[in-house]
């Protein structure tokens, strides 16, 4: 998110020239304005879920199962989206499995890669040396690997857990993509397996929205001849019940946003209440985090309008006034602002007051101060970009990234996300950890910033925009746009490696917190994969409908 708008008053009191972005309008009209939760259906789902949960819990802790079977059960639970019900039991099982793991010669590629991915996802640093037996004396993959589609698919997914210095996993990633792409639609794959491969190549497990990926996997799993009907039934019920909760929450948010009526006062801004809630649901979908989803959505909406104000409407002089007002964080500062900014500033103060009151009821309002300070920091960095645009200044890539890691919103989103977690998880120490500018938060911000720079570059430059990371890199290195894009994607991949490494034990803070930073990073991979899906919401419209409207047939 970067500033592109400056303007000068012409002929005294005339309206300044503004480089309006003409963002696409909201897609949703009044679609989410009303929703009545079917309490009878909710209770019906809930009663059966409780019975099935106990049956599945018994499966997880039951002895006598081989390690490969146990790791596969854990994988299925995670991919079906129901593992959050059994976190304690799963962690206990994984601790035992990792301690006893041996690179058994009988394990095939599918099983080894599955162990690797599951262990790494849970912070256990399994060495990629476990894959050596699938390579020949020249270091190339054995011919048998190319004939093992399930094994290659499992290895492909495992490569997304790589850290720096693991060149083999880079090679394996390129190899499996090439092999799997060559097989899609061919005679050697069943239609069901081909569908799985195509989806995996489009969206990896590790970088996908957990709830969306669960829904996809449920559709694959119910076609699996070896499926467990109890697991499948639990997954369907759980998805549909949680969807009802999310839909009700979205209705409350949507009505709140309509009643706030901010967009009518700042019509230049993107109207994205539904998309912000979608974003928040990726950060945490679990039922106990309803307050967190509401808090994060509201703050994201305010930041979105603030970004558009700096990016596509405000003059430089107006933006300086607004920056100063945000630093003061006092209602009296409103008097100095233009009318349209008064509406935004009033909303900012009121929403944070509302959030603070709601969290104070639960004794966890101490994070609000940190969120406010992060918001102030972003606004200061927005003004820096506004000044760069005004002066026609192209920063060095290093100077750009120093400021961009602030405007990428990593600190604000992480802080605001933590505010919605339980007090015994998001402690005061957790918020202080964010202030240390940890590598994981920086990496998450870098991913979001660089992906957005690439995907929105042409459109932003067409209307007039501060030099992005792509422009700064091209000028400093004297390379073409395409060459710069290649280098920026290398940086994005390294940032993902850093995230993966920061989640390996021992971790700096609780894994329950780190998973939220990971989830915030996943948003960039889904929403900005091919184009800026936040600015152009039709790109992610099907995702929104799938998550919040379309239940799974029972």
UniProtKB/Swiss-Prot annotation:
Entry keyword annotation includes Ligase: no
Short motif (DDXXD motif): ranges: 326-330
Catalytic reaction equation(s): (2E,6E)-farnesyl diphosphate + H2O = valerianol + diphosphate
UniProt pathway: Secondary metabolite biosynthesis; terpenoid biosynthesis
Residues holding Mg(2+) 1: 307, 311
Keyword Amino-acid biosynthesis: no
One MF term in the entry's GO annotations: magnesium ion binding
Binding site for Mg(2+) 3: 452, 456, 460
Protein family membership: Belongs to the terpene synthase family.
Free-text comment about domains: The Asp-Asp-Xaa-Xaa-Asp/Glu (DDXXD/E) motif is important for the catalytic activity, presumably through binding to Mg(2+).
UniProt name for this protein: Valerianol synthase TPS1A
Taxonomic source organism: Camellia hiemalis
Underlying gene: TPS1A
